[in-house]
Amino acid sequence: MKLLEERILKDGDVLGENILKVDSFLTHQVDFELMQEIGKVFADKYKEAGITKVVTIEASGIAPAVYAAQALGVPMIFAKKAKNITMTEGILTAEVYSFTKQVTSQVSIVSRFLSNDDTVLIIDDFLANGQAAKGLLEIIGQAGAKVAGIGIVIEKSFQDGRDLLEKTGVPVTSLARIKAFENGRVVFAEADA
C-alpha cells in the first residue's frame, strides 16, 4: 500500500536493527484517515470470504481492525491482555509473546462473541515473530470458528513471523513489508495489497 509506505518513510523512526517506531500515526497517536484507508484495503481483499467478525489484540491493532470491520459491516472483537472482573463467563485464552514489549501476556476473548458459525479476519498492527496472530488463531480455534485471513499493517519480513503463519495455511496479507533496515532507513519488499 503506497500510502502507508510513504507515511512510514515520512514519519517512521528506525530504532536499532529491528524496531520501527510509528507512534505518530499507528501505535500511540492514530491517523484515522490512514486507518480508514487501511480498513478499506483489507475489506476489499476479503469481501468475498464471508467474514462475520474481525478480531485483533489490544491495543494498536484496534484502530485498523475497527475500520476493516466497519468497511465489512461486521463486529470487531479485541482480545484483552488482562482479565477483568466483568469477564465472568466462558473465556477463550492463549499466551502471546510480544516482541516489542518483551513480555508474555495471557490474552482472552469472552466465548459468547465467537462461535463455530463465524468466519474471522484477524487484523494486527505488526508482524514480527507471529506470536500475536498465532495466539489469536488458537483462541479462534477454541471457538470452532474459521479464519479466512490475517491482515497485517506492517510486516517485518526479515523476521520469522510470516513463515510461522504461512505454515498454518491461513492467507497472510501485509500492506507494508519491510525487507530490511539499512543505515537507519526502511527498505521495502513488495506488499501483498
UniProtKB/Swiss-Prot annotation:
Which InterPro entries does the protein's record reference?
PRibTrfase_dom (IPR000836), PRTase-like (IPR029057), Pur/Pyrimidine_PRTase (IPR050118), Xanthine_PRibTrfase (IPR010079)
User: Where do the annotations place 5-phospho-alpha-D-ribose 1-diphosphate binding?
Assistant: 128-132
Q: A single GO molecular function, which one? A: xanthine phosphoribosyltransferase activity
Instruction: Please give the catalytic activity noted in the UniProt record.
Output: XMP + diphosphate = xanthine + 5-phospho-alpha-D-ribose 1-diphosphate
Q: What is its main location?
A: cytoplasm
Q: Pathway it belongs to?
A: Purine metabolism; XMP biosynthesis via salvage pathway; XMP from xanthine: step 1/1
- Top-rank EC class of the record's enzyme: transferase
Q: Which UniProt keywords apply?
A: Cytoplasm, Glycosyltransferase, Purine salvage, Transferase
Give the UniProt subcellular location, in the record's own words. Answer: Cytoplasm
Record-listed xanthine binding positions: 20, 27, 156
- Which top-level group of life is the source organism from? Bacteria
Is the keyword Methyltransferase in the record? no
SUPFAM superfamilies in the record = PRTase-like
Give GO terms for biological process.
Answer: purine ribonucleoside salvage; xanthine metabolic process; XMP salvage
Under which EC number(s) is this enzyme classified? 2.4.2.22
Per UniProt, what is one Pfam family of this protein?
Answer: Pribosyltran
Q: Which GO terms describe its cellular component?
A: cytoplasm
Q: Quaternary state and partners of this protein?
A: Homodimer.
Concerning its family, UniProt says: Belongs to the purine/pyrimidine phosphoribosyltransferase family. Xpt subfamily.
Q: What does this protein do?
A: Converts the preformed base xanthine, a product of nucleic acid breakdown, to xanthosine 5'-monophosphate (XMP), so it can be reused for RNA or DNA synthesis.
Q: What is this protein called?
A: Xanthine phosphoribosyltransferase
Say which species the protein is native to.
Streptococcus agalactiae serotype V (strain ATCC BAA-611 / 2603 V/R)
The gene is xpt
